[in-house]
A protein has these predicted regions:
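A short helix-turn-beta junction within AAA+ P-loop NTPase domains corresponding to the substrate/partner-engaging
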Residues: 525-531, 741-754
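Extended, folded cores of ATP/NTP-driven motor/assembly subunits in large transport
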Residues: 2-443
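Conserved P-loop NTPase
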Residues: 769-823
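Hydrophobic anchor at the beta1->P-loop junction of P-loop NTPases
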Residues: 481
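P-loop NTPase motor domains
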Residues: 89-90, 96-115, 126, 290-292, ...
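Hydrophobic positions on the alpha1 helix immediately C-terminal to the Walker A/P-loop
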Residues: 492
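Post-Walker A helix-loop "phosphate-sensing" segment adjacent to the P-loop in P-loop NTPases
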Residues: 499-509, 528
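Conserved lysine of the Walker
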Residues: 489
């Protein structure tokens, strides 16, 4: 039967496809002999384990030979590994652009590892000893009148601890291993890899540190003692004394595996290891984060083995050749049967397109191929809790179209592969490209739980964990409390004041323009003093007060003269300020007025404003008479409240509160400036005693204009050096950006406690601090005590709902209805 034109055309296409398939097959075969020789040997998986001698002791099960002091571990005759601990960054809260940048940086990080390096990422959520946590937040009694407040505050902290899951410690590690003939060769290469790994983490903005041998043993000990009760006791000097090996110091009391091959027992705890079967066509960066967000003891391990790029390309070409052969067979059938040869099984067409795209990714898009094993280890004190935890983890996997499969009869291999040693005994691997592997982003959100003199700042809104931080550890401990009226600014600052008072020996000074802090300071009894500054008050502050530590240099008069110039400028400067002649006269008289005090520094010789006034009258220049006349109302007139020697014993009280509400308009700005100088005097005196001074300024926007604004900028620049920690409270964010000089206050504040913000202020802050839209949602129509904490490079959303049924709450609150209820 003669062929029609369509059949002839199909046969020509078929012959062309056959020739193309042969060419692809030839490309795939190139280097086949070589790759067969260089193919790595099989790992010791389940069946290999059956053939080998079964371990008789726990020590024999732990798969390493020797741990060295520098952190290098020898697993076999030729395999050496090292471990680096890394810490979290705010990935989930970051802006979309920042997320993309972190993801791309992490892809580059993975691409660094070639086929000769095995990588293991270990994420450990482990139950810690609750007694240790409680001890770290405990405020011990001191046998004084404040123990009642200490107990109430301590009980509040313990109650907040119960709300969160601070019983879980979260740690992240990367272990990398290489093959080497001897330790010396391994050491050189591992140290080079370690340097590159740390540099790559630094590029990502991630803090990381290498573990030494002792720290690696402590890590293994914690993994093999999941209850956290047994402490790790080991020194290198113990080895020759006892004749034991390092394994003896980290091994649990017992290790057994169930007959059904599904669980194991380590010490008093039950556990099970599962592997993640990746079925989803597309993965999301939330999968790993959600697994680690489970409030359970879980360890997730990613074993990553890079494939040589040329080998990966050959493998794909070989697969494409196989697919083409299958396609040709289908096309032959179609031609023989007389139907269209383009009608082939859907799967063949799909697989062919996927293989083509994968080849293109490897050849032109900076992608590599990795073999990835994802292991999930659950551990619990009771079997029922273990099964519940596994069910919860399986639910997370199913949510993202994956499956969590138990490692039946491979629990021992799974457990050992979950230790941060860098060995994978499970031969269940999934091939993934760089971007598919990087979707398991190892970053979620930061936690902030410092020890020592750490203060309480609420609960992490994402994890419900306690936020405990020590501002003294910051490069710039200066702080700002920002929020709309009623958002909880004053309450938060007062809570911090109480915490500082109870936990430290530091001094606290409060600038209180609205007279809100008096009841709190009175709770501190003899250690607190409320100082009312007003025209009718009998509390006096001498603006001429000075101490010999007032300045860095040997002559404190230079800096004091600068303050008095600012004071006079405020009084008589007008719009144009003091003239050069007036400034010269004031500076001259300042130096003269302190001459007697410097010769004999006793309180009786401390000058007052009237002494400066008298000196000005004696000067010959007419400008001096003008200055004296302007000062007269503050010396002999109705505003002479600041023309007295100080009668406040500031150094006798730890907490001072300057109430400024009654000053009136005429004295308000002058009073604020004089108060700032009095605070500076206290800070400089405290520095010589090695004592920190905390300075809180409510309604901070009042001190951001004119001379007080300049003085505030100086405080923010210089206080840290003198042991001072200033904090400003304001709802007027725009005032903080009124000038480039005032804007420095923002840049010199590493602590920002941001509560609910008005619409205009939100946009300003987002631009100034680089806040993502998701982060901004935490300060948009948020409730009292809810917002964002900026602590150095860490940004954490917080919630602080202080218990209302306490004495402390009644003195901390500033809500009118609650204050009225307290008074009633």
């Amino acid at each position: 039967m003669p062929k029609n034109k369509q059949q002839e055309a199909q046969e020509k296409r078929l012959q062309k496809n056959i020739r193309q398939a042969k060419k692809t097959g030839a490309d795939a075969k190139q280097g086949k002999t070589k790759s067969a020789r260089s193919k790595p040997s099989k790992k010791g998986g389940f069946f290999a384990g059956l053939k080998a001698d079964a371990p008789q002791t726990v020590q024999q099960s732990i798969p390493y030979r020797e741990m060295y002091r520098d952190g290098i571990c020898r697993l076999t005759d030729t395999l050496y590994t090292k471990t680096v601990q890394f810490f979290d960054i705010n990935y989930q809260l970051a802006q979309a652009d920042d997320k993309a940048q972190i993801f791309e940086g992490y892809c580059d990080f993975l691409n660094y590892f070639d086929a000769s390096i095995h990588v293991q990422l270990t994420f450990i959520n482990q139950r810690a000893n609750m007694q240790d946590f409680t001890r770290s937040i405990d405020i011990p009694p001191r046998g004084d009148e404040y123990d009642g407040i200490r107990k109430e505050y301590g009980d509040m902290l313990k109650n907040q601890l119960q709300k969160g899951n601070n019983g879980l410690t979260k740690r992240k590690y990367i272990t990398f291993g290489i093959e080497a003939d001897d330790l010396r060769t391994a050491k050189m290469r591992l140290e080079r890899i370690e340097t590159d790994v740390l540099a790559n983490f630094k590029t990502l903005g991630v803090q990381a540190r290498s573990l030494n041998g002792l720290e690696r043993l402590e890590l293994l000990h914690s993994q093999l003692h999941p209850d956290g009760q047994e402490k790790f006791h080991f020194q290198w000097s113990d080895l020759p004394k006892t004749g034991l090996s390092t394994k003896d110091f980290i091994s649990p009391s017992g290790l057994s595996f169930s007959k059904d091959g599904k669980t194991f027992r380590v010490g008093d705890h039950s556990g099970a290891v599962s592997f993640l079967q990746i079925l989803a066509p597309e993965l999301t960066d939330r999968l790993l984060a959600d697994l680690l967000d489970l409030n359970d003891a879980v360890t997730v391990n990613l074993h990553i083995q890079s494939i040589d790029q040329a080998q990966a390309i050959r493998n794909i070409k070989r697969k494409m050749s196989d697919l083409q052969k299958m396609t040709i067979e289908e096309q032959k059938k179609a031609v023989r049967s007389g139907y269209d040869m383009d009608i082939i099984p859907t799967d063949l067409a799909t697989y062919g397109e996927e293989a083509k795209n994968l080849l293109q990714d490897l050849q032109s898009r900076n992608e590599r191929m990795f073999l990835v094993t994802v292991l999930v280890e659950n551990i619990a004190a009771k079997c029922q809790k273990l099964f519940n935890d596994i069910f919860a983890a399986s639910g997370v996997a199913q949510k993202y179209n994956c499956a969590l499969k138990r490692l039946d009869y491979q629990q021992e291999q799974g457990l050992m592969s979950s230790l941060a040693l860098g060995t994978n005994q499970i031969e269940i691997e999934r091939g993934l490209t760089t971007s598919s592997t990087a979707i398991f982003v190892p970053f979620t959100t930061c936690e902030l739980f410092q020890e020592g003199e750490a203060l309480y700042y609420g609960l992490n809104a994402l994890s419900n964990n306690l936020i405990m931080a020590n501002r003294k550890t910051l490069k710039n401990p200066n702080g700002l409390f920002l929020g709309t009226p009623g958002s909880g600014k004053s309450f938060s600052a007062k809570r911090e004041i109480v915490n500082v008072f109870l936990l430290t020996e530091d001094d606290i000074i409060i600038a209180d323009p609205e007279n809100e802090y008096g009841p709190l300071v009175q709770q501190f009894g003899s250690q607190g003093q409320v100082i009312d500054i007003s025209p009718t008050s009998t509390n006096y502050i001498n603006p001429m007060d000075i101490n010999l530590d007032y300045s860095d240099d040997e002559n404190p008069i230079t800096l004091k003269s600068d303050f008095i110039l600012s004071l006079c400028d405020l009084i008589i400067g007008g719009k144009e300020g003091l003239s050069p002649i007036e400034r010269t006269i004031i500076d001259r008289c300042t130096r003269l007025v302190y001459r007697e005090y410097l010769q004999n520094p006793c309180p009786e010789n401390m000058p007052i404003l009237g002494d400066l006034y008298e000196l000005l009258l004696k000067q010959s220049e007419p400008e001096a008479q003008n200055i004296a006349t302007a000062l007269e109302i503050y010396v002999n007139g109705s505003l002479n409240v600041f023309n007295h020697r100080s009668n406040i014993q500031m150094d006798k009280h730890r907490v001072l509160c300057f109430q400024l509400k009654s000053l009136g308009k005429a004295l308000k700005e002058i009073g604020l400036l004089i108060m700032q100088d009095a605070v500076w005097n206290r800070v400089t005196a405290n520095r010589s005693k090695h004592k920190t001074t905390w300075f809180y300024i409510d309604e901070f926007h009042l001190l951001l204009k004119g001379q007080t604004g300049s003085f505030s900028v100086e405080i923010w620049k210089r206080f840290r050096k003198w042991g001072g920690i200033p904090s400003g409270l304001t709802q007027n964010v725009k005032d903080l950006l009124a000038s480039r000089e005032i804007e420095n206050i923002f840049e010199n504040s590493d602590f920002i406690y941001m509560l609910n913000q008005a619409q205009g202020d939100r946009q300003i802050l987002a631009k100034q601090l680089g806040i993502s839209p998701h982060q901004l949602s935490y300060v948009t129509h948020s409730g009292p005590g809810e917002g964002l904490l900026f602590f150095g490079n860490v940004i954490i959303p917080f919630v602080d709902h202080f218990p209302k049924d306490t004495l402390l709450y009644s003195v901390l609150t500033t809500r009118p209805d609650e204050v009225a209820g307290t008074k009633a």
